[in-house]
Amino acid sequence: IIITIEGGIKMALDEIKYQTYVQILKEELVPAMGCTEPIALSYCASKARDILGTTPTRCLVEISGNIIKNVKSVIVPNTNGLKGIEAAVAAGIIAGNANKVLEVIADVKKDQIKEIKDYLEHNCIIVRPLETEHILDIKITLFDDDNYAMVRIVDQHTNIISIEKNHRVLFSKENKICNNEMVIDRCSLNVKDILEFANIVDLNDVKEIISRQIAYNSAIAKEGLTNNYGANIGSVLLNSGQDIITRAKAFAAAGSDARMSGCELPVVINSGSGNQGMTVSLPIIEYAKELNVNDEKLYRALVLGNLIAIHQKNGIGRLSAYCGAVSAGCAAGCGIAYLYGADYECIAHTIVNSLAITSGIICDGAKSSCAAKIAASVDAGILGYKMYLDGQEFKDGDGIVVKGVENTIRNVARLGKEGMKETDKEIIKIMTNC
């Protein structure tokens, strides 16, 4: 594709890669209500109830450690403050609409909230850790008299690989998430091509998804700043100043304040995470307001930021002991740099500098402190950019930093996916009092 952009510069991007990047954005930037892991439980439970054909009297919930970690402490939306695994499953059984996928419990009625609570009080929901090689693994079996239905989700929040009823396999597919076309597409991501794509993309190809991200994520950030949610990190930040850096951190944190506390507003996610979707987008949106840039510049900055976040997470994986906000905050710094006219060298240095600062932050599940980690990660993204402007950088050999942005990204992926496996196990043991 050859497209003339502002100033008459012509840039080319392979047609296949262009369409791949568009499709990645369409697949990743989808709306979800509530923290994604509990919603995945609700979705799985709702699907199993549909297969069973009646409300179950018993439930067996078998889940991987990272699902336990990310559901244990978070409030399930539309449940009047119910928290945890059993609440997410009960909400899916009583009020879920599996056809709405990650918005499965978006339309819970008031009388259904009481039904959810009654169900939790009068029915047996057994939760067991699942011995599995998959970081994200959900297996829910629902029983009623002599009938049962089972649904299993693996590797991605909506990836159903097995449906069974009364010993009959209704649906089964070999799980090829690690080798399928979608993940191969993500492996084609690299910083240089992402920047080129952001410069030349026909905005008609991405306008719908980016405009939805702006609208949804801005709305929940405003909600988080207006009302009392979690530890109110967004409001705490704004109480200390109103400069643009503080606002960028505060709006991202405020969205997380609300989301982690069960706010019913949807969020456009990134890499399977609402917190990451807000972290990468809201600082860029705030800077665009400050700089009074046009919509086109904002959209291109968000395209860049979202794809850089996805690029980093592709190597780390959906769930890890590595805090995903770090990747998203780094990507936000890149989007902000783009608003100022950054070139490839600037973007590359922003990434390396940022990752050198905050890559040690752990993920200990979804809960109110995520908002503070988001603020720290956004701050690192902005600092990484400002370091470059001042001629400063972290150099080859400074810890995990090596020469070349792609090499440093690979090191971080290795750290998050392989190096922190034992850390992840210990975090889960601590959180489950084992």
Q: Which residue stretches match the model-derived regions?
A:
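A structural signal for small-residue-enriched, beta-sheet-centric alpha/beta enzyme cores
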Residues: 13, 32-36, 63-70, 74-77, ...
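Flexible, glycine/charged-enriched surface loops at secondary-structure junctions
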Residues: 55-59, 100-105, 127-128, 204-210, ...
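Acidic-glycine-rich active-site phosphate/pyrophosphate-binding loop
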Residues: 12-22, 55-69, 243-262, 294-312, ...
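Hydrophobic alpha-helical bundle architecture
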Residues: 49-51, 77, 287-300, 310-376, ...
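Short, Lys/Arg-enriched N-terminal segments with co-localized hydrophobic residues
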Residues: 1-10
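Conserved phosphate/anionic-ligand binding catalytic regions in large, soluble enzymes, centered on
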Residues: 31-47, 265-282, 323-327
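Early transmembrane hairpin of solute transport permeases
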Residues: 39-138, 142
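Signature of multi-pass transmembrane helix bundles
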Residues: 117-262, 427-434
